[in-house]
Amino acid sequence: MKIWVDADACPKVIRETIVRAAERTGVECTFVANHVVPVPRRPNIHSLQVPAGFDIADNEIVKRVEPNDLVITSDIPLADEVITKGALALSSRGELYTKDTIKARLNIRDFMETMRSSGIQTGGPAALSQTERREFANHLDRILAKFKK
């Protein structure tokens, strides 16, 4: 198992949680972004900078991900693609996307996109709460423990 992080929009506090988990477990972890993402110098923690552009980082993750890898992303279409390839997808808010839930999330995303394109103000996501941070860390720990066995 490897961890792939869609680091372009990943909150710093979540990146720090991922780094701590990778350090503790030794799982290989790669942060993929179109800008420099500072990561500690560890043999199992990497940063991959891709060219700027629409979905370039997402496409790189999809190209490299393998079954049973874990992708950290809040990008619903990316989560759908990696789940289709047999990987796990976890949002930075602690939601584990599954084959059963991702289609509904895509429908909601598409509906909100339609509303925004018609001029309706939908607002952005709320700030990351302590509960969501804890939920993320707990899900990450459970996934890593499952695959360490």
Curated annotation (Swiss-Prot):
CDD domains per UniProt: PIN_YqxD-like (cd18720)
Signal peptide: none
Segments crossing the lipid bilayer: none
InterPro entries named among the record's database cross-references: UPF0178
UniProt superkingdom: Bacteria
Family: Belongs to the UPF0178 family.
Cross-referenced NCBIfam families: PRK00124.1
Protein's name according to its UniProt entry: UPF0178 protein VV1_1847
Protein source organism: Vibrio vulnificus (strain CMCP6)
